[in-house]
């Protein structure tokens, strides 16, 4: 079976309606999915038609199906996601049902041989599937759990469930009648106010699903810095429907749009260029974080058991000077957080104490947590660690507004991918690594964690950080002058980026 992940775009009807044609095409182009799923449990014909009109990949919404269409099946055929029949035997398939009411019939069809299971893994999409909580006992129950257990027993092939009523990013391994079924959410992720959200899902054949939440405001005209809903409407009224239109319009003409200042015009124009070219833009003459010698900074990342950690269970350091990577992982005793801290400091202070350390958003998380754990578990090294030069590239580029980056968000993996970084494709997120270690802490069973995969995830972050640093280091600068902006646009500042 191929290890290539299946990429699905889970797009609710509400999100589809909030995206105009240009923004919808932009979202699909950005996510580059194998298919688009509408996880709504009710028929949404207009949203379905809107999405089908905008994309060339399969669009799946079985709520509109007629007799015999209550279950649809897809698998990769010659590299493309294609509808396949019940007698096909792909290694990895996607079954989508109209509702949980269909699950018993699905199980019966598999039991009788009317439907043949996949060879290695089935991804089962169930709109309307969610979790109910008893108000008295507070016990949580997965709706249609018995039916899912029956499907899993009948198929025998490992199954991963995508639940339409649970938000993208949700994950729990449910034990259903002595059968364990991993359940992930594919509904709209937690939102940002009234802005509709949706998610790109990377489904790894081994069974895990990584969700990348997205907002409708990240696509189309609103993807550009300085453009809100009102400005987007005013630009469209002037015939500017896309970022390409903004990029090709002189700044002096953008200023003519009601409510657009020259600074905002420069901002949106420069951002359009950055997103189009994929090249970062240096906005100031500020130097990048300095080093103590001619060697580049070492890139550091930590993994914890949550945002209020009780342990730093993995520390990774990538040294671009000799392309080496060193990791420290607590695989045996999560009750002793000091062991990994001391091991890391023994190595780092002996071999790299004169090097500059670089992180992404480290001033907000990595450095404070490291300092807290050092003070508690290795106080004899606290003063030596204080002498280490530490910098935060995210602060320098984004919060201090020294650079404009091509990612749709300023998350490291998003920025690095936009800059051409090709990682290990682990299918993991920071939340999943934390959840995996929490499970290990609860059970004490190290076999519950795919250690090598989680180590690759941390190494990926370290190497991605260096890739972003090098891209910014080599990026051009844009001067802000009337002549330059009128002929090509510049960027004065990024206060609201």
Give the positions of each predicted feature.
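Acidic, Mg2+-coordinating catalytic module of metal-dependent nucleases/exonucleases
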Residues: 103-201, 405, 411-489
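Conserved DEDDh/DEDDy metal-dependent 3′-5′ exonuclease domain
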Residues: 5-142, 152, 327-417
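Low-complexity, acidic/Ser/Thr- and charged residue-rich accessory regions of DNA metabolism proteins
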Residues: 490-497
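RNase H-like nuclease fold core
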Residues: 297-330
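Long, highly charged low-complexity segments
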Residues: 6-8, 248, 256-298, 302
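Long non-globular sequence segments
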Residues: 189-192, 201-211, 233
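Helix-hairpin-helix
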Residues: 214-268
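Acidic active-site catalytic centers that drive phospho-/nucleotidyl reactions
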Residues: 301-303, 392, 461
């Amino acid at each position: 079976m191929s290890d290539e992940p299946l990429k699905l775009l889970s797009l609710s009807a509400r999100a589809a309606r909030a995206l105009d044609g240009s923004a919808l095409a932009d979202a699909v182009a950005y996510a580059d999915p194998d298919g688009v799923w509408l996880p709504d449990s009710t028929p949404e014909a207009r949203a379905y038609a809107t999405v089908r009109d905008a994309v060339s990949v399969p669009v799946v919404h079985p709520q509109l199906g007629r007799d015999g269409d209550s279950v649809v099946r897809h698998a990769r055929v010659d590299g493309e996601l294609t509808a396949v029949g019940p007698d096909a035997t792909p290694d990895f398939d996607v079954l989508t049902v109209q509702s949980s009411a269909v699950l018993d019939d699905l199980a019966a069809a598999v039991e009788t041989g009317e439907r043949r299971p996949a060879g290695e893994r089935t991804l089962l999409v169930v709109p309307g599937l969610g979790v109910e909580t008893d108000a008295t006992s507070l016990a949580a129950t997965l709706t249609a759990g018995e039916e899912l257990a029956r499907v899993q027993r009948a198929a025998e092939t490992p199954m991963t469930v995508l639940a339409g009523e649970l938000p993208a990013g949700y994950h729990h391994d449910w034990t259903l009648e002595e059968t364990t079924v991993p359940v992930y959410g594919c509904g709209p992720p937690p939102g940002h106010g009234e802005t509709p959200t949706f998610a790109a899902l990377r489904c790894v054949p081994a069974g895990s699903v990584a969700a990348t939440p997205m907002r409708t405001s990240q696509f189309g005209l609103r993807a550009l810095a300085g453009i809100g809903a009102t400005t987007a409407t005013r630009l469209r009224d002037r015939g500017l429907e896309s970022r390409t239109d903004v990029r090709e319009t002189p700044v002096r003409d953008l200023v003519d749009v009601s409510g657009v200042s020259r600074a905002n015009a420069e901002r949106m124009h420069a951002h359009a260029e950055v997103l189009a070219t994929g090249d970062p833009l240096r906005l100031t003459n500020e130097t990048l974080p300095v080093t103590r010698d001619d060697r580049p900074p070492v890139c550091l990342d930590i993994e914890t058991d949550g945002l209020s950690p009780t342990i730093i269970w993995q520390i990774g350091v990538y040294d671009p000077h000799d392309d080496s990577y060193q990791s420290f992982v607590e695989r045996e005793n999560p009750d002793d957080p000091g062991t990994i801290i001391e091991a890391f400091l023994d190595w780092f202070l002996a071999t790299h104490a004169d090097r500059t350390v670089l992180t992404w958003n480290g001033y907000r998380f990595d450095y404070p947590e490291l300092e807290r754990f050092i003070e508690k578990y290795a106080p004899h090294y606290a003063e030596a660690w204080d002498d280490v030069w530490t910098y935060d590239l995210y602060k320098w580029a984004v919060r201090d507004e020294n650079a404009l980056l091509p990612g749709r968000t300023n998350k490291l993996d998003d920025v690095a991918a936009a800059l051409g970084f090709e990682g290990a494709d682990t299918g993991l997120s920071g939340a999943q690594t934390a959840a995996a270690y929490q499970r290990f802490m609860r059970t004490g069973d190290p076999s519950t964690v795919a250690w090598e995969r989680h180590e690759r995830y941390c190494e990926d972050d370290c190497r991605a950080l260096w890739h972003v640093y090098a891209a910014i280091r080599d990026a051009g600068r844009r001067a802000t002058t009337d002549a330059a902006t009128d002929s090509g646009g510049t960027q004065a500042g990024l206060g609201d980026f």
